[in-house]
Amino acid sequence: MAEEKKEYKEPRSLNNDITTHVRFQNRCDRNATLYWLNFKGNLVRYSILKKGEYIDMITYVTHPWCAKEVVTNDRLVIDKEPVYYPSEGEEETYRLVLIDIPVYSLRERCKQVIWKSFPDIDPKTLDIPRLLTKELDTKKSVSYTNYKGFRHT
């Protein structure tokens, strides 16, 4: 019997008429960039939130959101998920969803500390495993467009 291949689809917005009210609040010690994933799955930057700040959004239940740390582009979680899909809520009531730091793997955390501690050093000069050197050599970059009402506090 042939194995059925499941096609993985990148998160993206789908057309939908069901609106929902969401309050995105940054609970972590890092500044967070809030992104909406548009209909092509591309990131659209909506806001930068400092610790404790929030933004109220009227969005759709089929519109996914994600957050990244402003400087390093490290993944953050929204409501404990790497990609947040709003749920249908009570009309006019904003549902609080928190932006937090996830539990990173030891490898990922080591890379974060090295990037932060030695931002201008060539990773090949460090006494670390070669595989880690290759991973560190690739800086994280994020491609996005700004929402026309982009908010930076």
Question: What do the predicted segments below correspond to?
Answer:
Residues 1-7:
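Short, charge-rich amphipathic alpha-helices with coiled-coil/heptad character
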Residues 2, 12-14, 60, 71, ...:
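Cullin-RING E3 adaptor/co-adaptor recruitment helices
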Residues 10-13, 18-31:
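Asparagine-centered strand-capping/turn motif at beta-strand->loop junctions
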Residues 31-42:
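Short, surface-exposed beta-strand/strand-loop-strand elements in extracellular ectodomains
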Residues 43-51:
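Short, acidic Ser/Thr/Gly-rich low-complexity loop/linker segments typical of extracellular
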Residues 52, 61-71:
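A short, solvent-exposed beta-strand micro-motif common in secreted/extracellular proteins
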